[in-house]
């Protein structure tokens, strides 16, 4: 048997036990829901395109005059940056991604707005979605290609996937909130 606690001690113990800032915060559930939605949608679309429709065998599909479905295997990070052909490079990228997810989770447990929690959750969901690809296939499956072609010029955006889009939307959400949202900090007035 352990020591007997007074009523006040029991209350303090239960409060301390429920406050786990590195695991769960005020809006962590909302961020987790956003991240899971991004992850599940990303993986479902990739699985359907790879194994249901078989985009690799069928080839590019012109969905609209400015949007195609194509299959590109990305061995780098978002938008094809830092391509890694070696297994060591792939594992280094995976390790960095895991570290980023852990740090983002800790950040998400500490935010005080729903907007930030959802934004960070989208980034985490996108990062995990691409990490699953890297583990399963050795590269990330990218498939969305926006482009504009006229008689004079052609604009072609990077090929990306829904995980990349979730990361970009999450970063944009954090930037928006840092610039326009949250509580305004006013400088103290000088003088009497």
Model regions and ranges:
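A cross-taxon signal for low-complexity, glycine/charged-rich
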Residues: 1-2, 7-8
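Alpha-helical transmembrane bundles and membrane-interface segments of multipass inner-membrane proteins
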Residues: 8-192
């Amino acid at each position: 048997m352990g020591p007997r606690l007074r009523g006040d001690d029991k209350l303090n113990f239960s409060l301390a036990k429920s406050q786990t800032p590195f695991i769960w915060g005020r809006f962590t559930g909302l961020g987790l829901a956003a991240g899971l939605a991004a992850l599940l949608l990303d993986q479902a679309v990739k699985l359907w395109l790879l194994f249901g429709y078989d985009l690799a065998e069928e080839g590019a599909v012109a969905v609209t005059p400015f949007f195609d479905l194509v299959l590109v295997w990305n061995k780098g990070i978002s938008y094809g940056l830092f391509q890694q052909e070696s297994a060591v490079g792939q594992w280094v990228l995976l390790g960095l991604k895991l570290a980023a997810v852990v740090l983002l989770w800790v950040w998400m447990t500490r935010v005080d707005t729903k907007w930030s929690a959802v934004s960070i959750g989208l980034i985490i969901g996108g990062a995990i979605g691409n990490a699953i690809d890297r583990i399963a296939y050795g590269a990330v499956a990218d498939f969305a290609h926006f482009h504009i072609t006229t008689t004079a010029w052609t604009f072609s955006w990077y090929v990306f996937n829904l995980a990349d889009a979730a990361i970009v939307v999450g970063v944009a959400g954090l930037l928006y909130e840092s610039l326009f949202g949250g509580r305004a900090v006013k400088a103290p007035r000088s003088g009497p």
